[in-house]
Amino acid sequence: MLKIFEKIFGSKHEKDIQKIQPVINRINEIQEGLKGLGDDELKEKGKALKSRIRGVLMPIEDKKKELYRQLDNPELSLEEAESIHSSLDALAEEYEEKTASALEEALPETFALVKETCRRLKGLTYQVMGRDVVWDMVPYDVQLIGGIVLHSGKISEMATGEGKTLVSTLPTFLNALTGRGVHLVTVNDYLAQRDKEWMNPVFDFHNISVGVILNTMRPEERRQQYQCDVTYGTNNEFGFDYLRDNMAGTVEEMVQRDFYFAIVDEVDSVLIDEARTPLIISGPVPNSDNSQFQEIKPWIEQIVRAQQQLAASYLTEAEKALKESPQSPEAGLALLRVKRGQPKNTRFIKILSQQGMAKLIQVTENEYLRDNSSRMHEVDDELYFAVDEKAGTIDLTDKGREFLSKLSHQDRDLFLLPDVGTEVAAIDDDESVIAADKITRKDAVYRLFAERSERLHNISQLLKAYSLFLKDDEYVVQNGQVMIVDEFTGRILPGRRYSDGLHQAIEAKENVKIEGETQTMATVTIQNFFRLYEKLAGMTGTAETEASEFFEIYKLDVVAIPTNRPIVRKDMDDLVYKTRREKYNAIALKVEELQKKGQPVLVGTTSVEVSETLSRMLRARRIAHNVLNAKQNEREAEIVEGAGRPGAVTIATNMAGRGTDIKLGEGVREKGGLYILGSERHESRRIDRQLRGRAGRQGDPGESVFFVSLEDELMRLFGSDRVISVMDRLGHEEGDVIEHSMITKSIERAQKKVEEQNFAIRKRLLEYDDVLNQQREVIYTRRRDGLIKERLTTDILDLLRDYCDSVIDRHSKNLDTEGIEEQLLRELSIEFKPDRNNLEENATGVSEELYNSALAFYRRKEEAVPADIMRQIEKYAVLSVIDKQWRDHLREIDTLREGINLRAYGQKDPLLEYKQEAYNLFIQMLSEIELETLSLAFKLFPVNPDEVRAIEERQRQAAVRQEKLVTQHDDAASVYNASPGAENEAPLQRPVTADSKPGRNDPCPCGSGKKYKNCHGQQP
């Protein structure tokens, strides 16, 4: 029905393009008029455009500067400050409106100027990444359309080879005229550097400064690059600089400007694929101990071997039962136990690909899952540990606990968590025990919980490392380090680590150095970072399949840009085999056939392991080829550029050359163009479209096909039942290949199922992070104010006023004058003796008296301490307290999130529970920030130069405390899975150390998410 309407009325994309066409005509008309100008005259046109736009914006900027200057006045009243803030808000709206209208008016002239500049640069030879390049690019009309779409704050979907990099120069040039800075976001440092050098002649012609942010740069270099009109860089670098700026100790240490306009290249990769991975800056945990991994590792290796032997016996049992009856329930149960015990067993995977086996296992599993999985324990009880591969969880069974108990010669109870609530309640109810002994006994319960919780957590992570994470698939080992491989691109992710001790577990498994545990110091999700920009746009060749997510999360519309020339690539149906062995042999034969023909072939793989397997097979056949994967990525650009030569064979993981064109060599067009051979379907249709898109650029011929087996990961986990039934109906025999549109559609349905699941994870992640994001905005705004303001005395005295009211209000009901004296002496180091009668009759007056007394003390301190030192004391008090409290708050939020899904068992919505408790923690943190800031400002009293230098040194160290950059990978997202059923493990705590009582501000070990002092640490 929808297609009928589109035929009659036109599609959305066609209507979008029709609206833009008159502007394109106007741009080309203006460009014709520019051809007669000399170079200097053309440059003057650019200067005039910039002056015109700046002339509109500068008066508003001057007004804002004046208002900010007024805010620094220490005598300013609260009402006057609020009035100024209202004026600033109004000016911000006016500024945004005038910027938009000025740029809209200048767009045709600016785009024409860029197009004419490109025309004049034709034939220019210059250096890009150390190689000579000749400029031969002038924007086509479709590229002008793409540029307008980007300027409008939308996503421009352009096919491979349509010149997205050149398109970006059009809106970048236009928005750079504002002087506010434009960010071009790419997926890696190489592309950032290359694109900056490649497009620089256009900007350089008009004296528009261009910078690039690279991973190796120092803060001083970064600041210079951000001051440029245009700055290229990766999403990670922009995001980490944002977090680092909000940890800076001085204004001079901050590197970024405001977030005005960002254009994201490969927007689907950055805003979709990376969105499950928060950006995290972390520092080492004091006194962290990784020795337990080495202690536990021998036990885990033995229990894993025992499980493997158990799985082998069940497979033998199943094979015997299947000979007697193809639908044997005994065989179904045995195979289900293998699926729950060792799902990646190669023998099991082969059986799974046989006719009717996947269905038999599913029917058996459904039987045991009835009535809320009430019988699933009958399956799992015979195993040492149960694996849920889809959910990524592992649960130690009673049999496993018994095994570990005998192995370690320790009590079986050591592998069980004590019921803290029940045991503490029993202690409280025991009237024969005095209060002091109750505290001692409770501490013993908490210590026991912490010890066992940490041990069980480490056991669980080691079991995951051995059962679910494969070397050369999820990670590689290089130079004695475990390096995560990006599941979407196949690239190594330097500096990234799995969270919650999983990375340390894999390091123990691989016998490399176990790095220390880290704690979060600052964090932001990709979604919430890019929401900081006033205007956001993106470009990619594959966005349409995720259009709804782009709009729902980022409010970004997707506009498909027509190609300059029609795409003539042939996309063939999938070729489906039963086993991987059959599939790999077929791939090797096809590659050999294509090489003999002289047609270049790009073989796309989903993992390092598969790329190396195929490489070995081709070497055995003496077929010359290049391999591009996470282990061998240094020659990426060179290999990809040569992949279009006659007879070239290139094996590449998904990383293959996004952002690098594969140009066809001489005579290749006549032989059919580049042949894309996918060795496996990826879980995302978009990644498959990207692979196909390597061929057929700019109207070139090309072919693409995917070779699939029923043993592939996607088919095994999500799609094999339906595909096997289709193959059975089509009469498939061992060794046969099936090519049918029904099969291809079934595979795409499986991919859609995974995409929906991943979208749900990303959306859930965002729902949780939105809570923290609102808190982050409050804290970062407070911190930035503390950093930028010259004087913080007014803020300190505002805190003092509230503090005095709070102290008097707290003690006036009981006329507790001693309590007032004690609190003031402890918290502010000041003496004040209130009159008991006044406290009863006029508490407000006593509060005013206290304020005046404290103010007089503070004024005397100001007179005694040099003004510049006093300003440093105030700044240090504000910044150091915010940093410490925010760091502690992030740890508490982590602890809260780890166990929040368990609330679903109590018929409560985990998200609502999380919002409420996170809010309570935040309010409590703000209260503690205010008290500690005030206390530090009053108590810190340097009396000699050494103490002054100590304050300066502490400020400097606070800003530099960024020992390790860590972005937590997939494991970070698992916390947000909505289903409590996916959480088969005991709640993963970040326990207190086993040899000490929890600190008052540490998370309570009971898992409530509250501070110890407000939970089980309360005095009885």
Swiss-Prot record:
Annotated ATP binding sites: 143, 161-165, 661
Binding site for Zn(2+): 1004, 1006, 1015-1016
InterPro entries named among the record's database cross-references: Helicase_ATP-bd, Helicase_C-like, P-loop_NTPase, SEC_C_motif, SecA, SecA_CS, SecA_DEAD, SecA_motor_DEAD
Broadest EC class assigned to this enzyme: translocase
Subcellular location: Cell inner membrane; Cytoplasm
UniProt entry keywords in alphabetical sequence: ATP-binding, Cell inner membrane, Cell membrane, Cytoplasm, Membrane, Metal-binding, Nucleotide-binding, Protein transport, Translocase, Translocation, Transport, Zinc
Keyword RNA-binding: no
Cofactor: Zn(2+)
Membrane spanning residue stretches: none
Family recorded in the similarity comment: Belongs to the SecA family.
NCBIfam families: secA
This protein's name: Protein translocase subunit SecA
Lineage of source species: Bacteria, Pseudomonadati, Chlorobiota, Chlorobiia, Chlorobiales
